[in-house]
Amino acid sequence: AISFPLMNLVLASSEDGRWQVVREGRKVNIIDRTANSCSCSRIFLTYMSGAVFDCSGMVLLLVARGLRAGVFLFRFANGEWQYRGELEPIPHQGVITKRLQKILLRDNRLIFVYNSRIRKYDVETGKLVYNKAVRHAFETEGEDLTQKFKGIYRTGFY
């Protein structure tokens, strides 16, 4: 059998350069570049395709594409990175879909704006706290993370 060396891939860095997310197979490490140490490490069932930090560097979202697609939430609290869970999809619809228009962060809420639906997730727990069908859904207030997410998908969401 042929074995390949494990490829380390940097998925993202925080805006201040302190944090770096490194994928090592299905394992993800959050590296503190100032202390040159691993702050948090987690093994997932699937490979992570990308990562998005908010501008404060306190919220991290990992994105898996493909068969086991999902969005996974980490939060920096009490001096360490903590895994808070997977953002809960609704029946028959994942979190990232081709109808997704905007991703915002405001008042401890991650807001996903679709063509005709708005979903809000609690940044502390990753739980879905608001899910409503809204005609011509429109929301603009908050830190816009949309372009950072689109960078993972290259040509738009799916």
Across the structure, where does each feature detected by a protein language model lie?
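A short helix->beta-strand "capping" segment at the edge of beta-propeller domains
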Residues: 1-4
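Repeated scaffold domains used in trafficking and secretory/extracellular systems
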Residues: 6-12, 44-54, 91-103, 136-158
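Short beta-strand elements that form the blades of beta-propeller/WD-repeat-like
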Residues: 10, 17-23, 57-64, 108-113, ...
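Short linear proline/tyrosine/threonine-rich motifs used for host-factor recruitment
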Residues: 20-21, 30, 83, 112, ...
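Structural motif
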Residues: 27-29, 67-73, 116-119
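Beta-propeller fold detector
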Residues: 39-44, 82-88, 129-136
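Feature marking well-ordered beta-strand scaffolds used for ligand recognition
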Residues: 40, 60-64, 99-100, 132
